[in-house]
Amino acid sequence: MALDTSKVLLPKEVATVITKRAKDTSTIAALSPSEPQLFLDKDYMVFTGNSEAEVVAEGAQKYSYEETLTPVVGKRFKVQTTTRVSSELQWADEDAKLEITSKILADQAAAMGRVLDYVVYHAFDPKKKTTLEGFNALAKSAVGVTATDDRVADIDSLAEVVSDEYDINGIALSKTMANELRKIRVPSTGQRFYPEIPINLQVGSLDGIPAATSGTVNGRLITPATGILAFLGDFRLIKWGMVRDIWSEIIEYGDPDNTGKDLKGVNQIAYRTEAMYSYAILDPKGIAVLKKPTSTGRTAK
């Protein structure tokens, strides 16, 4: 039985699985305190919450606080992944077909997770390896801290510059930063100073703060190197979600990924999955970024 090559809308259950797999490859998704929401564009009204309770004497006049609401518009972007395989897959038995297709979808879901970090942190297209026009990179808008030779002091400096309006509930580490922190030991005992530092995307902790590690933090595909070591702050300020309608199609003809090779001519078919992200950074002052001294950027120390 040949595969159906029409463009199909993935069922809600499958779309939800792909969305959750994005959490396994994105530090932003991993550190977000809430589940990803499936939505299109969204306007956020930022509520500053500066009111304080007033002590009122018997019969005294009561005063109010006028709240200012600042709108932040979500930024929407479309993502796609295309994977070429041998056209013989169309005629494979059902078990083999299911296994291979599942691996393709898992690989594409992982790519969709990584692209979230690349767009939000760096305004960068990881496939084309180009800067995205019209996007504001968090690496440039967050409060900058220049790294020193003392990584413990660097963590303290990051925490100091985050606006005191916000809680610190997450830190995203580059692999370089995570490895350096794991090497720090208490001189008197030899124990690790940060024993729960993660070396992968499984959330660990640093000083009680949820932590995740990935090459997307520094943007390993970006040249020249960004020099970014970590982002720390209130990750609830990064609102993101994926559209529920995730499309997948099997393409038999043409050159859908612009490789210069026609699918029929090389006996291949292509799997393509498309989705739509939307995100907004409510206040970049609630997040700090640690950069090596050689990288450019403003310093808040």
Where are these regions (language model features)?
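Short helix/loop capping segments that flank catalytic or ligand/cofactor-binding pockets
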Residues: 53-55, 93, 180-183, 280-282
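Structured loops at beta-to-helix junctions and adjacent beta-edge loops in soluble globular domains
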Residues: 47-49, 86, 174-176, 214, ...
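Alpha-helical scaffold segments that mediate packing/assembly in large oligomeric complexes
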Residues: 84-164, 289-301
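Assembly/oligomerization interface modules of large self-assembling protein complexes
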Residues: 2-82, 286
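Sequence/fold signature of self-assembling virion shell proteins
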Residues: 4-6, 94, 187-301
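Short, Lys/Arg-rich flexible segments
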Residues: 2-30, 88-95, 113-120, 126, ...
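Extended, solvent-exposed, turn-rich assembly/linker loops in the middle of proteins
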Residues: 129-205, 209
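Short loop/turn segments at secondary-structure transitions that flank enzyme active sites
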Residues: 50, 89, 114, 177-179, ...
